[in-house]
UniProtKB/Swiss-Prot annotation:
The lineage of its organism: Bacteria, Bacillati, Chloroflexota, Chloroflexia, Chloroflexales. Pathway: Lipid metabolism; fatty acid biosynthesis. The keyword Phosphoprotein applies. NCBIfam families: acyl_carrier, PRK00982.1-2, PRK00982.1-4, PRK00982.1-5. This is Acyl carrier protein. One of its GO terms (cellular component) is cytoplasm. Residues 4-79 form the Carrier domain. Its main location: cytoplasm. It is found in: Cytoplasm. Carrier of the growing fatty acid chain in fatty acid biosynthesis. HAMAP family: Acyl_carrier. The modification O-(pantetheine 4'-phosphoryl)serine is found at S39. One of its GO terms (molecular function) is acyl carrier activity.
Length: 82
């Protein structure tokens, strides 16, 4: 289960990158449908997540990250595997 610190940092990054209020960034929120991200927003957000958490997210994996929870789970999995 992702730590509260990881979740808080991810929410902060998403809020900054997408210009949305952190209160809207819930685990079930979908980046494109609920948070109005376009493809450029998603690329920039993924790059920021990679830098913040020290993980690499290949394009084929990034395409599967649909919700905030998907992002949390993916990053946690990458950190545990390292």
């Amino acid at each position: 289960m992702p730590s509260p610190e990881m979740e808080a940092r991810l929410k902060q990054i998403v809020a900054e990158q997408l210009g949305v209020d952190e209160s809207k960034i819930v685990p079930t929120a979908r980046f494109t449908e609920d948070l109005n991200a376009d493809s450029l927003d998603l690329v920039e957000m993924i790059m920021e997540l990679e830098e913040a958490f020290g993980v690499e997210i290949p394009d084929e994996d990034a395409e599967k990250i649909i919700t905030v929870q998907d992002a949390l789970n993916y990053i946690e999995q990458k950190l545990q595997a390292a």
